[in-house]
Amino acid sequence: MEAEHGDVWEALRPLCARVMSVPPEAVVPQARLVADLGADSLDITELEAASEELFGVSLRGTEKAGVSTVGDVADLIVRLRTPGAHSPLAR
């Protein structure tokens, strides 16, 4: 799973930078989407849609309580891509 997490991170970092109009070096695992990167609700919606296309998982409708950093998003994507990890909310 560690290799997959690295792959997700490598794809997620430039995606977040593009969606939130920030330099890629600002996108670090501990960066908070709203407080640090300035994401608004439209940015979050765009990130969800782009993640669905890029990673083949839907973040919409998933339990996102506690997801506040870029690292949290990466962890959520890895969990959703793991067989058997899908909850009924993820559909």
For each predicted feature, which ranges?
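Phosphopantetheine-dependent thiolation modules in NRPS/PKS and related acyl-activating systems
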Residues: 1-49, 53-91
